[in-house]
C-alpha cells in the first residue's frame, strides 16, 4: 500500500517520519495513523516532531500498514518470534508471524539467533508482515563470524545493521547504552546481565578492552538509519533479570546514557524508542516509567513485562502481564509480550497465542485506566450483549473469540444454547442477569421509599406500588 508514497522520497538524504514532521509535513503514514488512532493529523505530526510518538516504517517495507507508538496513541503490544540453533525454520516463523498478527500483535520482532539462514528467515517474515518488524542485529553480527568475539569487528556490526535496513526492518534494538565503565556495577547482582545482546557487547568489551562500538559509532548508525527511516529501539543491556536487581545502579546508569543517545539521534532526525525492564516489583513500576520519561525526554518507552515475581516458570505470561498493565497505566507506550515458555524454551504457536492475549488484555486495561477516548466502548458493548444473553455477539467482541466459544461449548454445544438465558455456571434457574430491573420498577420503589419518610429499610415493610 505504501509503494507510491515511498517512491517520491527515494534518493532523499533523510526519509524519516521525524524529519518530515519537523518540516511541518503530514506524510501519508501520519495521515493513515491519525485515522487508525482517531486523532487529528496535526496532533500526530506534532507528537512525531516532538519525539513522543514514532511511526516505524522502513521505506523498503512497502506492504506495511503504518502504526504509531507513543503516549498519545493506544498502548501497543509486540510479539517476539525467531528461530534458534535448536528449533524452528523459516516456514514455522512465518506461521508464528501470521498467528501473532491474527491475535493482535502491533509489531513483531524476529529474534532468530542461528541454525537457519537468518537472511532468508528475516526476508520471509518482512515480506509476509503488515506490521512493523524489529530485529537485534548483534545476533547476526556474532553469527557472521561463527560466534568468535575475538574476530568480531566494529565494521561487522555496522555491516549487519545496514543489511537489516536494506531488507526492510522497521526498527532495530541497538545496545549502545552499555558502556565499559558500567560493567563493574553488575557485581552485586543475583543474575548479572540477562540481555543476550548486552551479553555479546559485554564480552566484546572485556576481550578487546575497548568502549562499546555501538556507542562510539552511534553517529554512523544514525546516518544509516535516516536513509531508510529505520527506528532506534535503544536496548537496555542492564535490565534487571530478577526482583533483587530491579532499579539498581547498573540499570539507572545505563538509562542515563540511553537518554543521551535519544537526544543524539533526534539531532539527526532519527526516530527513537527506549527499551525497559524486565523484572520489577509492583511498587517500583511507576518509578521506573517516570524515571525513563525524565531521563529520555519522553521518548516512547517499550518494556518487557515487567515480571512482578520470579517464582512462576510456566506462568510468566501472567506474572508479566500484571506488571505490563501497571506500566501501561503509568505511561509506557508499548509492551513486549512474554509467553508461558519464558525462561524455559523457545515458544511454539500456542505459546505465542497465550502470550499475546495476556498482553492485549494488559494493554487494553491500561488504555481504560488512562481514560483514552473510546477505550471502553468495546467493554460496554460486550456487557450489553452479556446482559441480553447474546452469546454470538459476546464471542465476536472477545479478544479471543475462538477460546470464548470453545469454553462455552464444552458443556452447552448445541445451537439452541446460543439463545439460552443461562450458561452452565448458574444453570437455567439461578442466573442473576435473568432478573431485569426496569426504570419503571425503580421509579415505583423511589415513590414507596419517599412515602415511608426515611424509615429504616431493615425493619420497614414496603408496600408494592401497583
Swiss-Prot record:
InterPro entries found in the cross-reference section: ThiC, ThiC/Bza_core_dom, ThiC/BzaA/B
Keywords on record: 4Fe-4S, Iron, Iron-sulfur, Lyase, Metal-binding, S-adenosyl-L-methionine, Thiamine biosynthesis, Zinc
Function, in words: Catalyzes the synthesis of the hydroxymethylpyrimidine phosphate (HMP-P) moiety of thiamine from aminoimidazole ribotide (AIR) in a radical S-adenosyl-L-methionine (SAM)-dependent reaction.
Cofactor(s) the record lists: [4Fe-4S] cluster
Family note: Belongs to the ThiC family.
HAMAP family per the UniProt record, alphabetical: ThiC
Binding site for Zn(2+): 279, 343
Top-level lineage group: Bacteria
Catalytic activity annotation: 5-amino-1-(5-phospho-beta-D-ribosyl)imidazole + S-adenosyl-L-methionine = 4-amino-2-methyl-5-(phosphooxymethyl)pyrimidine + CO + 5'-deoxyadenosine + formate + L-methionine + 3 H(+)
Recorded GO CC terms: cytosol
One function term, GO molecular function aspect: zinc ion binding
EC id: 4.1.99.17
Protein name: Phosphomethylpyrimidine synthase
Binding site for [4Fe-4S] cluster: 423, 426, 431
Source organism per UniProt: Synechococcus sp. (strain RCC307)
Cofactor note as given: Binds 1 [4Fe-4S] cluster per subunit. The cluster is coordinated with 3 cysteines and an exchangeable S-adenosyl-L-methionine.
Gene: thiC
GO BP term, pick one: thiamine biosynthetic process
Amino-acid positions noted as binding substrate in the UniProt annotation, renumbered to this chain: 80, 109, 139, 175, 195-197, 236-239, 275, 302
Pathway of action: Cofactor biosynthesis; thiamine diphosphate biosynthesis
Amino acid at each position: 500500500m505504501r509503494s507510491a508514497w515511498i517512491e517520491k522520497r527515494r534518493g532523499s538524504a533523510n526519509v524519516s517520519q521525524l524529519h518530515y514532521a519537523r518540516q511541518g509535513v503530514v506524510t501519508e503514514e501520519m495521515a493513515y495513523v491519525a485515522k487508525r488512532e482517531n486523532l487529528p493529523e496535526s496532533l500526530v505530526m506534532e507528537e512525531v516532531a516532538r519525539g513522543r510518538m514514532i511511526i516505524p516504517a522502513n521505506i523498503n517495507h512497502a506492504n506495511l500498514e503504518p502504526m504509531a507508538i507513543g503516549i498519545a496513541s493506544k498502548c501497543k503490544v509486540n510479539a517476539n518470534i525467531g528461530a534458534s540453533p535448536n528449533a524452528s525454520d523459516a516456514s514455522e516463523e512465518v506461521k508464528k508471524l501470521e498467528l501473532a498478527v491474527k491475535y493482535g500483535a502491533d509489531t513483531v520482532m524476529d529474534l532468530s539467533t542461528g541454525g537457519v539462514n537468518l537472511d532468508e528467515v528475516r526476508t520471509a517474515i518482512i515480506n509476509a508482515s503488515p506490521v512493523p518488524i524489529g530485529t537485534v542485529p548483534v545476533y547476526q553480527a556474532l553469527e557472521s563470524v561463527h560466534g568468535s568475539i575475538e574476530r568480531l569487528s566494529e565494521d561487522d556490526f555496522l555491516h549487519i545493521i545496514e543489511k537489516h535496513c536494506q531488507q526492510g526492518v522497521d526498527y532495530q534494538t541497538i545496545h549502545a547504552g552499555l558502556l565499559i565503565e558500567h560493567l563493574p556495577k553488575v557485581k552485586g547482582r543475583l543474575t548479572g546481565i540477562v540481555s543476550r545482546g548486552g551479553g555479546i557487547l559485554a564480552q566484546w568489551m572485556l576481550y578487546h578492552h575497548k568502549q562499546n562500538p555501538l556507542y562510539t559509532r552511534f553517529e554512523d548508525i544514525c546516518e544509516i538509519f535516516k536513509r531508510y527511516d529505520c527506528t532506534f529501539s535503544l536496548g537496555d543491556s542492564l535490565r534487571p533479570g530478577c526482583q533483587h536487581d530491579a532499579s539498581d545502579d547498573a540499570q539507572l546508569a545505563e538509562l542515563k546514557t540511553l537518554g543521551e543517545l535519544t537526544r543524539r539521534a533526534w539531532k539527526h532526525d532519527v526516530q527513537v524508542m527506549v527499551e525497559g525492564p524486565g523484572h520489577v516489583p509492583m511498587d517500583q513500576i511507576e518509578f521506573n516509567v517516570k524515571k525513563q520519561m525524565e531521563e529520555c525526554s519522553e521518548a516512547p518507552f517499550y518494556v518487557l513485562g515487567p515480571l512482578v515475581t520470579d517464582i512462576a516458570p510456566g506462568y510468566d505470561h501472567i506474572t508479566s502481564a500484571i506488571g505490563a498493565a501497571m506500566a501501561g497505566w503509568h505511561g509506557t507506550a508499548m509492551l513486549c509480550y512474554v509467553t508461558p515458555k519464558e525462561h524455559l524454551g523457545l515458544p511454539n504457536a500456542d505459546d505465542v497465542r497465550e502470550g499475546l492475549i495476556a498482553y492485549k488484555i494488559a494493554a487494553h486495561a491500561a488504555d481504560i485506566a488512562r481514560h483514552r477516548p473510546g477505550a471502553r466502548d468495546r467493554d460496554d458493548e460486550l456487557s450489553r450483549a452479556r446482559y441480553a444473553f447474546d452469546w454470538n455477539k459476546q464471542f465476536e467482541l472477545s479478544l479471543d473469540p475462538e477460546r470464548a466459544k470453545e469454553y462455552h461449548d464444552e458443556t452447552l454445544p448445541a445451537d439452541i444454547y446460543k439463545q439460552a438465558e443461562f450458561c452452565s455456571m448458574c444453570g437455567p434457574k439461578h442466573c442473576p442477569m435473568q432478573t431485569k430491573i426496569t426504570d419503571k420498577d425503580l421509579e415505583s420503589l423511589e415513590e414507596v421509599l419517599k412515602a415511608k419518610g426515611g424509615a429504616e429499610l431493615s425493619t420497614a415493610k414496603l408496600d408494592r406500588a401497583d
